[in-house]
UniProtKB/Swiss-Prot annotation:
SUPFAM superfamilies cross-referenced by the UniProt entry: RPB6/omega subunit-like
Pfam family, one: RNA_pol_Rpb6
Similarity section: Belongs to the RNA polymerase subunit omega family.
GO biological process annotation, one example: DNA-templated transcription
InterPro entries in UniProt: DNA-dir_RNA_pol_omega, Pol_omega/Rpo6/RPB6, RPB6/omega-like_sf
Alphabetically ordered keywords of this record: DNA-directed RNA polymerase, Nucleotidyltransferase, Transcription, Transferase
Record's GO cellular component terms: DNA-directed RNA polymerase complex
Native species: Afipia carboxidovorans (strain ATCC 49405 / DSM 1227 / KCTC 32145 / OM5)
Catalytic reactions on record: RNA(n) + a ribonucleoside 5'-triphosphate = RNA(n+1) + diphosphate
Protein name listed in UniProt: DNA-directed RNA polymerase subunit omega
The keyword Zinc is annotated on this UniProt entry: no
Record note on quaternary structure: The RNAP catalytic core consists of 2 alpha, 1 beta, 1 beta' and 1 omega subunit. When a sigma factor is associated with the core the holoenzyme is formed, which can initiate transcription.
Length: 130
């Protein structure tokens, strides 16, 4: 029997690197007990997987999808979007459905100055000469 080469498979999978990834993944699947779709002919699993790709008994798109799923560490879950929060001070801000108003607390200038007096000034650090 003639040996399977990359040239036999390159018209099925355009990129040689993708072909190697897919064939290796299929060979691991065969090693873990997945049934083969071509005669083994005393060939090893990587050769059998290349022959399956060349004979189109296995779809490369399906292999690619299985490879991606096998490499995923986290399952993507579609979570609901959080409620949108209107921007503060935007002129066209939408009003909530329940029409509740937000109470804004006003400070006088004297209250503001008293609050600022309570703050400690930042410590001055000596300037370093270079």
């Amino acid at each position: 029997m003639a040996r399977v080469t990359v040239e036999d498979c390159i018209d099925k999978v355009d990129n040689r690197f993708d072909l190697v990834l897919l064939a290796a993944h299929r060979a691991r699947m065969i090693s873990s007990g997945s049934p083969i779709t071509v005669d083994r002919d005393n060939d090893k699993n990587p050769v059998v997987s290349l022959r399956e790709i060349a004979d189109q008994t296995i779809a490369p798109e399906d292999l690619k999808e299985e490879l991606v799923h096998s490499l995923q560490k986290f399952v993507e879950v579609d979570e609901p979007e959080p409620d949108t929060i209107p921007l503060i001070g935007s002129a066209g801000a939408s009003v909530d459905a329940d029409d509740t108003e937000v109470a804004v607390e006003r400070m006088t200038e004297e209250e503001l100055l008293k609050g600022l007096e309570g703050l400690a000034p930042p410590e001055e650090q000596p300037e370093e000469e270079e």
